[in-house]
Amino acid sequence: MSDLARLLDEVAGEFAPDPRTSVFEVAVEGDSLVGQTTEAEAVEALLALLTERGTTLRDEVVRLPDPMLAGRRCALVCSPYGAVHARPAMAATQVSQYVLGARLDVLTMRDGWLRVRGEDGYIGWMHPGYLEVGEEDWAREWETGSAGESLLSLDAALHDEAGRTIARLPWGARVIRDQPRSIRLPDGRRGALGAGELVPMARRADRFPARGDSVVRSAREWLGVPYLWGGVTQAGVDCSGLVQSILWMHGIALPRDADMQVRVGAPLAPVPGELLPGDLAFFAEQERVTHVALSMGEGLVIHSALANGEVAVDDLRGDRDVERRLASLLVSARRVLPD
C-alpha cells in the first residue's frame, strides 16, 4: 500500500469508520482530490496532512448532500415500505427498509437511484419509485404534523369512496389527517380508514409506554412474521429490524443493526434469568455481534431468527438444540428502557 493510500485509509478510519452511517469515497486523480463525503472535516484534515508532507492538491471533493440537489434534498416514503440497497441496483443486497411516511435526507443521485440517509442515520440506495422528493420545509411540515394531525398505522388500510383499497399501511407508517374523514399520504393521495387502526402521534406515549410489559405485548403481535434480511415490517423482518421497529413505537430510537444497538443503553450481565422484560440480549459469532433478541423475562426471548424462519419465542434455559446453541452465543445485554 502506498503512503497516500495509507493516509486515505487513516483519515477514513478516524472520520468515517462505518460506511453504514457515513460516506468517505475520496481518491487522488492527477493533481486533484476527487470523490464525495458526508464528512467535510475529513477532507480538511486530509488536505492539511498532505500539505505537511509537501503535497498540494486541488480540492474537488463533493460534500454531501450534493449541492446540485438544491430543492430536492428531502424525501418521504410513499409506498408501504421502500427497500434500501447496498448499491444502486435492484440486484444489490437489501440492507434495510423505510416505511411509508418516513422522512429521509437525499445525499446524491447515481444511475437514476437516490442515496439517502434515514432518521436512524443509516445510508443506502433507494429507487425513486418508492419516494416523493421535495424541499426541507415540505418535509418538515410532514414530519411535525403541522399540516394536520400526525397518525401512526397499526396495519391500517385506506379505502377510496367505492370501498376499494388504495394503500396498505404497515406498522409504524405515518400519515396525516387534515380533514375529518380524510387521510393524506405523502404523495397527495387521500382515503378513509377502511381496516386496522390509526393512532394519533400525540397519544403514542399513552398507547405505547416505555415499559417492559408493554414492549413485550407489542412484540407478541409480530409472532409468526417471516424472517427477511433487511426487513422492518410484518411482511418480513430481521432481528435488529424487529427490535428497532417495536421500540420506536415505544419512544426508544435505536440504530439499525445489532452490532450498533449493542452500544446503546446500560450494560447488563448476560445472564438469562436476570434479564427483565424489554431488555436486549446480544449474540456473537467469531467475536462479532450478529444477532439481537428482546427479553420477555424468566429466560425467554422473542426474536426473528433464520434458525426459526420467523419471529418466535425461545427459552435461553431450554433443552432444544436451537435454544442451547442460542444460549451458548449470548455475550452481552443492554437495558434501553427507563428505570
Please give the residue ranges for each predicted region.
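Structural motif
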Residues: A102, A173, G278-D279
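Boundary regions of SH3-family modules and the immediately adjacent low-complexity/disordered segments
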Residues: R20-F24, E44-L69, R73, A89, ...
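Aromatic- and glycine-rich peptidoglycan recognition patches
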Residues: V133, A205, L268-V271, M296-D339
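Short alpha-helix capping/helix-loop boundary micro-motifs
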Residues: R87-T93, A156-T165, V262-V271
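Short, well-ordered loop/turn sites that connect or cap secondary structure elements
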Residues: A92, Y98, L169, E274-L275
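Short, aliphatic-rich beta-strand segments
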Residues: E29-T37
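...with weaker cross-activation on analogous glycine-rich loops/strands in unrelated enzymes
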Residues: I252-E310, L316
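Active-site nucleophilic cysteine motif
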Residues: A219, G231-H250
